[in-house]
Amino acid sequence: MRLERLAVNKIKVFLTFDDLKERGITKDELWQDIPKVHDLFRDMMLEADDELGFKADGPIAVEVFALPAQGMVIIVTKGHQESDFDEDGLEDGYIEMQVTLDESDEVFYEFADIEDVISLVPRLVTLGMTGGTLYSYQGRYYISFTDLDLDGIDEESLIALLAEYGYPSTISTYRVAEYGSLIIANDACIKLYQSFFKART
């Protein structure tokens, strides 16, 4: 389980499928109202309090994103009781959760710096990955891999490499493509490799 603060009232939690498996939870059960899911959310909130000082002391909205071969990203947002959420059900200190489930068919990763992307590229090329589309948006960098890009690639190894340098993105590719800047449309990995590494040999 990895936690990251996105804003004063918002955190991102990344759970691998191993994290879920250890608790006997499938991705389809994650949004269901069952005791083991309650236990998971309680543990998440305790860890968020310990690590980030994020206290779930009122209504929260929970967005769950399923990422293929990667795990689940959970966005937890605290609401303002007066406006964002209905106050019904809060009398007993119950945490109200509004859950949204979304599933993506692509691999889409976010990086803090272009240097992270450049450092990653030779390792991806060694793995056989030549494709991908590179974007920038709000000072961060994003790589998208389609099913065609992933054909013949060991996805577990790919995800392990990507996770060393970046994070699964919870922003959709559509948003980044529409509001961000397209840097390399196709074959981003091999083009970056040829630009930054082949010239040195």
UniProtKB/Swiss-Prot annotation:
It comes from the Bacteria. GO terms for biological process: establishment of competence for transformation; negative regulation of establishment of competence for transformation; negative regulation of sporulation resulting in formation of a cellular spore; sporulation resulting in formation of a cellular spore. Pfam families: MecA. One of its GO terms (molecular function) is protein-macromolecule adaptor activity. Signal peptide: none annotated. Keywords: Competence, Sporulation. The keyword Ribonucleoprotein does not apply. Coiled coil: none annotated. The keyword Oxidoreductase does not apply. The N-terminal domain has binding sites for ComK and probably for unfolded/aggregated proteins; the C-terminal domain interacts with ClpC. Homodimer. PANTHER family: ADAPTER PROTEIN MECA, ADAPTER PROTEIN MECA 2. Belongs to the MecA family. NCBIfam families: PRK02899.1 (NF002781). Enables the recognition and targeting of unfolded and aggregated proteins to the ClpC protease or to other proteins involved in proteolysis. Acts negatively in the development of competence by binding ComK and recruiting it to the ClpCP protease. When overexpressed, inhibits sporulation. Also involved in Spx degradation by ClpC. This is Adapter protein MecA 1.
